C-alpha cells in the first residue's frame, strides 16, 4: 500500500505542477447538475392539488420540544408533502440525526420573528439548496422577507433555489395535503394602533438577487452586498402568526373482496370507472341492481384540523382568546380541531384566561405543549459518544448534562401532553399518540456496548498504566487556561460533531469564544447544564474568524441568552467585545434594523485592527482593544489573514503569564500563521480532510491532517490540537504516521488543560479500539479511491511518467491567495 500511495503522490504531483502555474488560483471543480427530485416528478403526475383526494397518512412529530437548549419546532409529514413549523438553531442537526429528511421540505412556517424561531433558517436554506430543491416557500411575520435578504450578506445570492415569502395577510394556502390559514395576533400593547405592514393581499414576493438597493451609502456604514436594502424596516416583536391547518377530504377505500362477492369485474379495465364513481359517493348499477357507494367503500375522512399557536407571554393571552377565527373552530365546529400545539411558557399556561380558551375547543381536542418544562434529551448520539469517551478519561471527556425540569406543569381539565423529542400525533389513518420513536437515553447501554468492543477494555487499561507515572510539569498543572471544544465539525451541524466553537476559560471568571457556529449555546447547555448562566456571565469576548455560516450564526443566540443570564445573576448588561471581520457588522446591522434589537449587545473590534503593524485611526477602537487586553488579562491579541475566503483571519492570544494559544480558523497551510504563532504553547488548527486529499483541500481552501501538523511543527508549537473535521469523519479522523507525541484530536465537549498535553497522544490507541469499525470503513473508502486514481492515472499516462521520474516529488504548495468561497466547504 505504501508503494501505491507513493505512486499516487507522484502522479498527483506531476498533474498539479504541469496543470497550474504558481500565479493561478485553484480552480473549482464543477458540480454535476442535479436531476429533478423524484418526488417533484411524482407530484407533476398527480396533477393539481386535491385532484386525487387527500393523503392516506398524516402525522405531526416534535423535532424540538421547547427546552432552552433546543427551542420548539414541529415537523408535519404526509406522503405528498413535508412541513416545518419554526427553525431555531440546532433544528437541522436534530432532523439529520433522527432521519427526518429535509429533501422534500418545501414549506416552512414561522410563528414569530425571533432568533429562537429563525436561528437555524440560514443553514437550513443552504442545505435545501444543496439537495437540489428548486423552491421553498416561507410563511410568517412581515419582517421575514428582509431577514432572507440579510442572510445573503454571508451566504451569497442563493442561486439554484427560489425562495418565496407568503405574507401573513395573504389568502389561505392550499396544496395536496391541506389548506393553511394564517392568523396574525398582536399583543395588547399594539392593539388598536395602525400596522403599516398590513397591506392589501398580495401575491408571493420572490427574493430576487437583482433587487436594487439604495444607490448611495455612507462610507462609515457597513457595506451591504448588491440586492440587500439599507433602509430601516418595521421591527416589531408584538406580532405572532398562528396557523390553522385543515386536511383535505380523503375518499374511502375501495373494498376489493366485497366487490368480488358482488360479481363486479375486478381485475379488468371495466372496474376503473366503477371505483372512481363509488369513491365520489355515487351509486352504480350492475346487472340491473343498484349498489350504494357505502357498500363498496369505507367511509370518507372529512379531514381534521390542527392548530399551531405561539403565545410568548401574558400580553398575547387576551388577543388570542378574543380572536374570531379561533372561535369558529371552538365548540360545535363544522371542522373539529384534533390537536392544538401550544408554544407557550408555563406563565401563560397557568393563566386562567388561557386555560378557559383551551377548554373551549372541547373534550375531544388534544393539546400538545412545547416549552421550557421539557426534560427530553434531544441529541442522543452526542450523549452516547460522550458516555463512551468518558470511560477512557473522565476529566478530558466529562459526561453531558441536561436541563432539569423546572416544575410540574399545571393541572388542566383538557387532554394535555408535554412535548418530547420525536413524539408523534397521527391524524391519519387513525388519530392517536405514538410514543415508540421517543428518545430514551440509557447510559448503561452505551457503556455495555463499548465494553463489548474487541480490545477496548485492554487498551483503556494499558492507557491508564502508561499515564499514571507521567506527571505533568509543575508549571502546567494549573486548571487554567481550560479549553472546551464545543464544535469540531465543518460545514453543517451533524449528529456527533457540531460546527465551529471553542471556549477558552482564561480564569474562573473570564472566558472567550473562538468562533461561534450555529448551536453553540445548545452545546454550552449540554456541557454545563444549569451552570450555563454562570458561564455566560464570564464571557468577555468572541472572536469570529470569517463570515461562513458555520463560524458565526450562533453569535446572536449567545448575545440574547447572555442578556438573560446576566439578569438572572443580578448583573448589569454590558456590551460583549466581538473581534471579527468588519463585514460582520453589515449582517448584525440588517438583523437589528429589520428583526430584533441586537446592536446594544456588542462592541465590535475589526479583526484587521489587530494585525501586526496595523494603524488604528479610531480612538474608540483603541479603547476597546485596551479593554479586551485588560479584561482577558492578555499581553497581546493578534490576528493575521489566512488562506481561505476573503477576510478570513487566524488569531493568537498571549497571556500575561506567558502562555500563547493560536487558532487557525479555516485555512490552507499559511506562512503568516506560522510567523504569528511562533513558539505557541497550543496551536488549534483545522484539519478538514485526510491525507491523500490534498487537491480537494486546495479546491476548498482547507488543510489535511498532515498539513496541519506540519504547520505546528514549523511554528515550534508545544502542542497541536487538530480540529474542524469534515463531517465525513463523523466520529474520528483517519490517523496518519505523522501523528506524534505533540498531536491530539479534538472532540465535541472535550476539556483540555496544558497539563493534559503528555496524556493526549496516548489516547489514540483506546480511540482506535472504540472506533475500530468506523476506521475500517474509512480505510476501505480510501483504498477504493486510491485504486480509482491509479486506474485514471494509467489511462492518462501520468503513472508511467511518474515511474520514469524516480523518486516521488512533494506536492508543491500554492502561495497565491485563494478565491473567495461563496457559501461553505465540506
UniProtKB/Swiss-Prot annotation:
Q: What is its EC number?
A: 3.1.26.11
Q: Per the record, what are the reactions this protein catalyses?
A: Endonucleolytic cleavage of RNA, removing extra 3' nucleotides from tRNA precursor, generating 3' termini of tRNAs. A 3'-hydroxy group is left at the tRNA terminus and a 5'-phosphoryl group is left at the trailer molecule
- For this entry, list what GO says about its biological process: mitochondrial tRNA 3'-end processing
Any idea which UniProt keywords this protein has?
Endonuclease, Hydrolase, Metal-binding, Mitochondrion, Mitochondrion nucleoid, Nuclease, Nucleus, Phosphoprotein, Transit peptide, tRNA processing, Zinc
What's a single GO CC term here? mitochondrion
What GO molecular functions are on record for this protein?
Answer: 3'-tRNA processing endoribonuclease activity; metal ion binding
Transit peptide extent on chain: 1-16
Cofactor(s) named in the record: Zn(2+)
Enumerate the residue ranges of region (Disordered): 15-51, 189-231, 798-826
Main localisation, per the record?
Answer: mitochondrion
Question: Which residues carry the post-translational modification Phosphoserine, per the record?
Answer: 199, 208, 212, 229, 618, 736
Q: Where in the cell is it found?
A: Mitochondrion; Mitochondrion matrix, Mitochondrion nucleoid; Nucleus
Amino acid composition bias (Basic and acidic residues), ranges on this chain: 27-38, 208-224, 808-820
Q: What class of enzyme is it?
A: hydrolase
User: Which regions are flagged for Polar residues bias?
Assistant: 15-24
A Pfam family found in this protein is Lactamase_B_4
- Function of the protein: Zinc phosphodiesterase, which displays mitochondrial tRNA 3'-processing endonuclease activity. Involved in tRNA maturation, by removing a 3'-trailer from precursor tRNA. Associates with mitochondrial DNA complexes at the nucleoids to initiate RNA processing and ribosome assembly.
According to the record's subunit comment, the protein's assembly and interactions are: Homodimer. Interacts with PTCD1.
- Family per similarity comment: Belongs to the RNase Z family.
| The protein's name | Zinc phosphodiesterase ELAC protein 2
| Organism encoding this protein | Gorilla gorilla gorilla (Western lowland gorilla)
Amino acid at each position: 500500500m505504501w508503494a501505491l500511495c507513493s505512486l499516487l503522490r507522484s502522479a498527483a504531483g506531476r498533474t498539479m505542477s504541469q496543470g497550474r502555474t504558481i500565479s493561478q488560483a485553484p480552480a473549482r471543480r464543477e458540480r454535476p447538475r442535479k436531476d429533478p427530485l423524484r418526488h417533484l416528478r411524482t407530484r407533476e403526475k398527480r396533477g393539481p392539488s386535491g385532484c386525487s383526494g387527500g393523503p392516506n397518512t398524516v402525522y405531526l412529530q416534535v423535532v424540538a420540544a421547547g427546552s432552552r437548549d433546543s427551542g420548539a419546532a414541529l415537523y408535519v409529514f404526509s406522503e405528498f408533502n413535508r412541513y416545518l413549523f419554526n427553525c431555531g438553531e440546532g433544528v437541522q442537526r436534530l432532523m439529520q440525526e433522527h432521519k427526518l429528511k429535509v429533501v422534500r421540505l418545501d414549506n416552512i412556517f414561522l410563528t414569530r420573528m425571533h432568533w429562537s424561531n429563525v436561528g437555524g433558517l440560514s443553514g437550513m436554506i443552504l442545505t435545501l439548496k444543496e439537495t437540489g430543491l428548486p423552491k421553498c416557500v416561507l410563511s410568517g411575520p412581515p419582517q421575514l422577507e428582509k431577514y432572507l435578504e440579510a442572510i445573503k450578506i454571508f451566504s451569497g445570492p442563493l442561486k439554484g433555489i427560489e425562495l418565496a415569502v407568503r405574507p401573513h395577510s395573504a389568502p389561505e394556502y392550499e396544496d395536496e395535503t391541506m389548506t393553511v390559514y394564517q392568523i396574525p395576533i398582536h399583543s395588547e400593547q399594539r392593539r388598536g394602533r395602525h400596522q403599516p405592514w398590513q397591506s392589501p393581499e398580495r401575491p408571493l414576493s420572490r427574493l430576487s438577487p437583482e433587487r436594487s438597493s439604495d444607490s448611495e451609502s455612507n462610507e462609515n456604514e457597513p457595506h451591504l452586498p448588491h440586492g440587500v436594502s439599507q433602509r430601516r424596516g418595521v421591527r416589531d416583536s408584538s406580532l405572532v402568526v398562528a396557523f390553522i391547518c385543515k386536511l383535505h377530504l380523503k375518499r374511502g377505500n375501495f373494498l376489493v373482496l366485497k366487490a368480488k362477492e358482488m360479481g363486479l369485474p375486478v381485475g379488468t379495465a371495466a372496474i376503473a370507472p366503477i371505483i372512481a364513481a363509488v369513491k365520489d359517493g355515487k351509486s352504480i348499477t350492475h346487472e340491473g341492481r343498484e349498489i350504494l357507494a357505502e357498500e363498496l367503500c369505507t367511509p370518507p375522512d372529512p379531514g381534521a384540523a390542527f392548530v399551531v399557536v405561539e403565545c410568548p407571554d401574558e400580553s398575547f393571552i387576551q388577543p388570542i382568546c378574543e380572536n374570531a377565527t379561533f372561535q369558529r373552530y371552538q365548540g360545535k365546529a363544522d371542522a373539529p380541531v384534533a390537536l392544538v400545539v401550544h408554544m407557550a411558557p408555563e406563565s401563560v399556561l397557568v393563566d386562567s384566561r388561557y386555560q378557559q380558551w383551551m377548554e373551549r375547543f372541547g373534550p375531544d381536542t388534544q393539546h400538545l405543549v412545547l416549552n421550557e418544562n421539557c426534560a427530553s434529551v434531544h441529541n442522543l448520539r452526542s450523549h452516547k459518544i460522550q458516555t463512551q469517551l468518558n470511560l477512557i478519561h473522565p476529566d478530558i471527556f466529562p459526561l453531558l448534562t441536561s436541563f432539569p425540569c423546572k416544575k410540574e406543569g399545571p393541572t388542566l381539565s383538557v387532554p394535555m401532553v408535554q412535548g418530547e423529542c420525536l413524539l408523534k400525533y397521527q391524524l391519519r389513518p387513525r388519530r392517536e399518540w405514538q410514543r415508540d420513536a421517543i428518545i430514551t437515553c440509557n447510559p448503561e447501554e452505551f457503556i455495555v456496548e463499548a465494553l463489548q468492543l474487541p480490545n477496548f477494555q485492554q487498551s483503556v487499561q494499558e492507557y491508564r498504566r502508561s499515564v499514571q507515572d507521567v506527571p505533568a510539569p509543575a508549571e502546567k498543572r494549573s486548571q487554567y487556561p481550560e479549553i472546551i471544544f464545543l464544535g469540531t465539525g465543518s460545514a453543517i451541524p451533524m449528529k456527533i460533531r457540531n460546527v465551529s466553537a471553542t471556549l477558552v476559560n482564561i480564569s474562573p471568571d473570564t472566558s472567550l469564544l473562538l468562533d461561534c457556529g450555529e448551536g453553540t449555546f445548545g452545546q454550552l447547555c449540554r456541557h454545563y447544564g444549569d451552570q450555563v448562566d454562570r458561564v455566560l456571565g464570564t464571557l468577555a469576548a468572541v472572536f469570529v474568524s470569517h463570515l461562513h455560516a458555520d463560524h458565526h450564526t450562533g453569535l446572536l443566540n449567545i448575545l440574547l441568552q447572555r442578556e438573560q443570564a446576566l439578569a438572572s445573576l443580578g448583573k448589569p448588561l454590558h456590551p460583549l467585545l466581538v473581534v471579527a471581520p468588519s463585514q460582520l457588522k453589515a449582517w448584525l446591522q440588517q438583523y437589528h434594523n429589520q428583526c430584533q434589537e441586537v446592536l446594544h449587545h456588542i462592541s465590535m473590534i475589526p479583526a484587521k485592527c489587530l494585525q501586526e503593524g496595523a494603524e488604528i485611526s479610531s480612538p474608540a477602537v483603541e479603547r476597546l482593544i485596551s479593554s479586551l487586553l485588560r479584561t482577558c488579562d492578555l499581553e497581546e491579541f493578534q490576528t493575521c489573514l489566512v488562506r481561505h475566503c476573503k477576510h478570513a483571519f487566524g488569531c493568537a492570544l498571549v497571556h500575561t503569564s506567558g502562555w500563547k494559544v493560536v487558532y487557525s480558523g479555516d485555512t490552507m497551510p499559511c506562512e503568516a500563521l506560522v510567523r504569528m504563532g511562533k513558539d505557541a504553547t497550543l496551536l488549534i488548527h483545522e484539519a478538514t480532510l485526510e491525507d491523500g486529499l490534498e487537491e480537494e483541500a486546495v479546491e476548498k481552501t482547507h488543510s489535511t491532517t498532515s498539513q496541519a501538523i506540519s504547520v505546528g511543527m514549523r511554528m515550534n508549537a508545544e502542542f497541536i490540537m487538530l480540529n474542524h473535521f469534515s463531517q465525513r469523519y463523523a466520529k474520528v479522523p483517519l490517523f496518519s504516521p505523522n501523528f506524534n507525541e505533540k498531536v491530539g484530536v479534538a472532540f465535541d465537549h472535550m476539556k483540555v488543560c496544558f497539563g493534559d498535553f503528555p496524556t493526549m497522544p496516548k489516547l489514540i490507541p483506546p480511540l482506535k479500539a472504540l472506533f475500530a469499525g468506523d476506521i475500517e470503513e474509512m480505510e476501505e473508502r480510501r483504498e477504493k479511491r486510491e485504486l480509482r486514481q491509479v486506474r485514471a492515472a494509467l489511462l492518462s499516462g501520468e503513472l508511467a511518467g511518474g515511474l520514469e521520474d524516480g523518486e516521488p516529488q512533494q506536492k508543491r504548495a500554492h502561495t497565491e491567495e485563494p478565491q473567495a468561497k461563496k457559501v461553505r466547504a465540506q
